[in-house]
């Protein structure tokens, strides 16, 4: 389990001076050049920038970085009227592109991909299925059958609960980091102690999220044919009831939360490590292959700066894809353990117009692995893998469309 979300939300503030942190006085005026007195020298260390929202795909400046200068002469006077308008237009295009690209990435990962996630989970927990749905074409066919018999809502069920789980994860991480002083992020010069504390924080977050993730999983896989639409806060109520052993009575085969915690934390930590490592490697190779560019002026500066967004999007895409593929067998086992004993009835992924109950009797992680291997074979761990192919194909198409739109915006800005 690895919710896709922004790592931080510090991109909505001014950074670069004490005023940007709320400690000092307001600068004399706000333009694309730093304010200076008549006796100032060519030192530009006291400059400030405004950064776009820190959402996936944006490239914020951090402490110690400097914004590109539009003029090389340190003794130049105030900008002319035309130059000021050009800088303002370039800044607007920069903000629009950063926000639009990040918004497109968030939409793809959390909204457009949700039908694929629903089918992927249903196939993973359906131990009755004879068709393993390994091909993307079979996934598209079953999507059509579900939509035809149950309507479009059958592919979007449980989407609200996934956002609730992400919100709980973000809130828990922030509160735990505040009270335990465990690092939420690693600096460039990290050591083993910081790494251990950071992974410990992630593990504690997954422990807290486990009961709510289990409730969200039930909402995404249960059939719409025999179940009414759940409320927005049902995920919270079910998660709290699972912790306190209250609410709807479950089967005796329901596994305790302690049994579910280990595979959930293991999957979350491994997913985070793999995705973070691949993301940094992809960015490193892209930066190594790209030749360094000299500071440009006008629309060329906007073009060069906005092109920095796409390596990050590509790195996020590759990181998520590799982590999902490598950990797919573990995810299948984890979902089967979570769904056992919850009296959940899912759609028949072989036919698309019937329902089947979940009546597994796994005793734990090891028993689940051995049972799947014995009864369904090695490919049983990859049931529904075609949904992953469809999901990331759609993601790649959206990235390409976003790049085309971005190029058109830059050409128009010129």
Curated annotation (Swiss-Prot):
GO terms for biological process: axon development; mitochondrial fission; mitochondrial membrane fission. One of its GO terms (cellular component) is mitochondrial outer membrane. InterPro entries: Mitochondrial_sb/sol_carrier, Mt_carrier_dom_sf, SLC25A46. Residues 29-50 have a biased composition (Polar residues). It holds the Pfam family Mito_carr. Keywords: Membrane, Mitochondrion, Mitochondrion outer membrane, Repeat, Transmembrane, Transmembrane helix, Transport. Residues 1-13 have a biased composition (Basic and acidic residues). Solcar repeats lie at residues 92-183, 307-412. Residues 1-89 are annotated as: Disordered. It is a multi-pass membrane protein. It is found in: Mitochondrion outer membrane. May play a role in mitochondrial dynamics by controlling mitochondrial membrane fission. Belongs to the mitochondrial carrier (TC 2.A.29) family. This is Solute carrier family 25 member 46-B. The lineage of its organism: Eukaryota, Metazoa, Chordata, Craniata, Vertebrata.
